[in-house]
Amino acid sequence: MKRISESGLEEILILTGESPKESDVKYIGEACKIAKKYFRVIGLEVYPMNSSDYAYLYECGADFVTVFQETYDPDRYSQLHLGGNKRIFPYRFYTQERAIKGGMRGVGLGALLGLNDFRKDAFATGLHGYLLQRKYPKTEMAFSCPRLRPATGKSSDYNCINERELLQVICAYRIFMPYAGITISSRERSGFRDNVIKIAATKISAGVDVGIGGHTGKEHKGDEQFEIDDGRTVKEIYKAIKDAGLQPVMSDYIYV
């Protein structure tokens, strides 16, 4: 984390898989405590938890929780998740609300566009965020816009959406919820990301390395979870934002 912070980043996202056995709450909490030494904002993208767990992680320094419903169609969801805790649709659906009750100042939502009819899932995602905002007006809402992309060991192009359709979704989110955050990941190509920050996006990742140990110089090749299309460094992303006539902001959260 020290190495990442030296790049100039002030926010970090801590990720785990879906197994509490491999990454229990205490382990994630220790990671948050370490991250708090180097970063202003700590986001979590981990398996769904109970409110008490989120309260503990908040005390450890976490600020923000993102969970992807993947698809909002219960029938399609059950086809894709045959076992394990992840198969429980309602528990995953109410994750953001439990995180808010646990003290988190913000939550993120997203469907994996392409698993089902992307327009229906995008509509459901927007409605989910809108209803949460109505119920918890002081909580920051944000949308992520992942779509099916190549993954290690897998090859599938069914229901994949193109950039034009993805931009349609992003613009719909912006019109529907003008003050929500919109995040665009490094899995999208640089040209697309450079354009979308001028239109609707509020946050983009930079200097991403998805391999284990990638920032330490001891990366285990072949362990990457997925491929990225925009491999630019933090300095390169910073310059691209300025060249677009925009102001790069490493963190917009002020502690008082």
Language model segments and positions:
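Core AdoMet radical
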Residues: 4-99, 105-109, 115, 137-144
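Alpha-helix N-cap and loop-to-helix initiation/capping positions
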Residues: 23, 27, 83-91, 117-124, ...
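Catalytic cores of alpha/beta
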Residues: 50-59, 105, 115-131, 189-200
